[in-house]
UniProtKB/Swiss-Prot annotation:
The keyword Disulfide bond does not apply. Coiled coil: none annotated. Catalyzes a trans-dehydration via an enolate intermediate. The gene is aroQ. The active site is at Y23 (proton acceptor), H100 (proton donor). Keywords: Amino-acid biosynthesis, Aromatic amino acid biosynthesis, Lyase. It catalyses: 3-dehydroquinate = 3-dehydroshikimate + H2O. It comes from Dictyoglomus turgidum (strain DSM 6724 / Z-1310). Substrate binds at N74, H80, D87, I101, S102, R111. This is 3-dehydroquinate dehydratase.
Amino acid sequence: MIKVLVLHGPNLNLLGVREPNIYGRVDFQTLNNLILQKAKEREIEVEIKQSNFEGQLIDWIQEYRDWADAIIINPGALTHYSYSLRDALLAFGKPVIEVHISNIYKREEFRHHSVIAPVALGQISGFGVNSYLLALEAIFLYFNK
């Protein structure tokens, strides 16, 4: 069975409340339930974590290194400047998919650059909460090619 660590970065716990015109009205718990449902359909075991702290995300990447076959991460604003998060994902050494609910390339200029994307298998953005489900599907296909 494929094992995936799903990491939600800063402010993602406020889904459904924070800027619903950008991030939608699906709340955080509903998103996690959708992820669990999709994972069950594909027989993928998932562990879901959220933190507003960069160091905690890095600790989880290191802690789950032996357990996880892949990581799905929405780094939030850390996408644009967190070289320590980037380095932790690189050290993970297995597939990483960067996800974003909004299309970061249709937003403010500072959001157009990701320091995470160069160390990721791929990036999925702009599909709302479905970005996470598409990432799970991509991981399933990656391991079942």
